[in-house]
Every structure is written in C-alpha cells, then in structure tokens.
A protein has these predicted regions:
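Catalytic nucleophile-His microenvironment captured as a short glycine-rich beta-strand/loop
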Residues: 131-157
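Structural motif
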Residues: 116-118
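Glycine-rich loops and low-complexity Gly/Arg-rich segments
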Residues: 120, 140-144, 167-170
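Divalent-cation
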Residues: 93-106, 111, 122-134
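Residue-level marker of positions within ordered structural domains that often coincide
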Residues: 54, 122, 148-149
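Cysteine-nucleophile protease catalytic domains, especially the papain-like/related folds used
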Residues: 2-103
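Noncatalytic regulatory segments and standalone regulatory/sensor domains
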Residues: 147-176
C-alpha cells in the first residue's frame, strides 16, 4: 500500500456530503460527451467534491488560466487553497498524520471535515480496466462514508462517487 503522503482537511462547520454512489450524478464537466480525458485526478477530484457539496466548481477552473509551459513541460494544474477559501469559504490544510489512516479518516466527520487522501489505486474498483488489482498507482480520493464494522467506504475519485468493500477496504487502509 502507498502510505498517505498528504491528508488534507477541508474545514467548514459540519461539512458533509449526503449523496451515495447509487444516486450521485457527476458534474456536467464529467459527462460521457466531454471532449477531454481524465488525466488530472486532483483537478477532477475538486470538481466532484465541490459539486457534491452543492457548490459550482466552474469558478475554481480559473486556475487553468495560470497553466504555464517552459518549452518542454506544462505545469501541473491545480486549484490553489487560497482560491478555494475565497470562492467557497473552504479551509484547505495539510495534517500531520500520526494515527493510522483509517482512524484519521474516521475522525473527519466528528471534526466536521473531509479528507483528501493519497491511496493505492490497486484497491479502487472504479479503476477496473486500468489499475484495479493490476498496478500500484498513487491517486487521491475523498472518503465520504467509512464504516469499519462492515468494511465499506464510499469515496469521490476522478469523475464520480464509488464504493469499495471487503478486501479492498482492508487493502486501501493497510489492514491486510
């Protein structure tokens, strides 16, 4: 398992996402008729996180105007924490992770925060056909619901909300 290098807290009084994978509808920028591939998990994750919170993610896409190219490589496109604070009142900060990952993520709802967490996509069912049980690739998710007792997690990743359970739950949290 790839250990979480970054765990980010998104704090706003009692921040919660109430959708489930069964009823979640992705933001229109992630519909099947889009003309670009999902290649920036960070940008895609913020689009869906803001959308799931009932916020319009389009203003946050202004960060695309700051993309730069040095003649060989493009800069990595991402929303800046200050922009998210100004646009939506969301506080984005990195936490010093000292508890096991599962305990850290479980503590979020009690503290009124969501976490972005870097995990190994080997354990993410939504990556079937690419990395799921095939390749160890770092990616970022936002756990929305975690239930240790039934080994279940709902999470935002790329262009939607998904569910993992059982052995995948154990694997993503390093319980195996």
């Amino acid at each position: 398992m790839i250990t979480p290098a970054v765990t980010t807290g998104l704090a706003e009084s009692g921040i919660r996402i109430s959708a489930s994978p069964a009823d979640y509808r992705p933001h229109f920028s992630h519909t099947g008729d889009r003309i670009w591939p999902e290649t920036n998990c960070y940008l895609d994750l913020w689009i869906e996180t803001l959308h799931a919170l009932g916020l319009d993610p389009v203003p946050a896409l202004a960060c695309a105007l700051s993309a730069d190219h040095d003649g060989l490589q493009w800069t990595f496109l991402k929303q800046e924490p200050e922009d998210l604070r100004r646009l939506y009142g969301l506080e984005v900060s990195e936490e010093a992770v000292w508890l096991p990952l599962l305990e850290t993520v479980e503590s979020g709802p009690v503290r009124g925060i969501l976490h972005t967490v870097e995990v190994d996509s080997w354990w993410l069912p939504d990556t079937a056909g690419t990395a799921y049980h095939a390749d160890h690739v770092k990616t970022t998710i936002v756990p929305v619901r975690v239930d240790r007792s039934i080994r279940l997690m709902w999470y935002l990743h790329n262009a939607g909300m998904y569910e993992l359970a059982g052995d995948d739950f154990d694997g993503v949290f390093g319980l195996v």
